[in-house]
């Protein structure tokens, strides 16, 4: 992905490259989007599917079904004439509901997927909007997008949607998403702790070297520090023993 964004030549289908660029653009503009605006939802779809589908940024006008990799129809989306009103109702519910945002965002994700408002790109928009809702509640989620959370759990993700569809309610999907979010948060915390430990280890090592130097010297100057710690860093003033 980095190579694509840096303009380097990448051996990949043009569609894949376009998806990466489109995704980067919309996630860069995440804080500009109103999570309860129909217009912003359509704008997001327009950006994410630009150059990839015939009609971007508009609700579908034909019946659509959700199919699996083998072409089996999993469920049919809402009849197109009802899509705009249902999407507006769902956005209003997300704005006014008193359910905790962690659960509310999961319900929104599932219900928008069920409505299936677009001819293509529904999953990407659902996951983006899930991220947007969470990031409005806690900005940390802007750095932990739902798209990344489910990246390695896609089979479980689609299975949870299918089971919930069969059951006629979203409990299984909500439980899966909350579990995936928790796991990703724990991984992020673990990585942060590891980086902090590594940084602390380097700082401790520098001070140990300085302490050893001061055992045989009365003081240490900035120039001496650079030579002692061996990494080009120095203190702003002399350190005396």
Named regions from a protein language model:
Residues 1-241:
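FIC/Doc superfamily catalytic core
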């Amino acid at each position: 992905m980095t190579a694509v964004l840096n303009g380097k030549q990448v051996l990949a289908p043009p569609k894949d490259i376009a998806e990466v660029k489109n995704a980067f653009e919309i996630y860069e503009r995440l804080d500009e989007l109103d999570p309860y605006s129909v217009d912003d939802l359509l704008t997001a779809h327009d950006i994410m599917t630009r150059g990839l589908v015939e009609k971007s940024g508009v609700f579908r006008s034909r019946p659509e079904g959700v199919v699996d990799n083998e072409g089996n129809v999993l469920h049919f989306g809402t009849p197109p004439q009802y899509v705009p009103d249902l999407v507006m109702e769902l956005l209003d519910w997300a704005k006014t509901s008193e359910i905790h945002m962690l659960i509310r965002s999961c319900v929104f994700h599932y219900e928008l997927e069920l409505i299936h408002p677009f001819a293509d790109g529904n999953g990407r928009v659902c996951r983006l909007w899930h991220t947007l809702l969470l990031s409005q509640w806690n900005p940390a989620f802007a750095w932990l997008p739902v798209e990344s959370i489910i990246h390695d759990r896609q089979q479980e993700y689609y299975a949870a949607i299918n089971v919930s569809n069969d059951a006629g309610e979203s409990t299984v999907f909500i439980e899966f998403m909350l579990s995936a979010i928790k796991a990703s948060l724990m991984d992020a915390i673990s990585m942060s702790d590891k980086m902090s430990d590594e940084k602390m280890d380097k700082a401790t090592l520098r001070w140990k070297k300085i302490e050893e130097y001061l055992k045989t010297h009365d003081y240490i100057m900035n120039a001496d520090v650079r030579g002692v710690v061996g990494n080009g860093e120095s203190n702003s003033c002399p350190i005396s023993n």
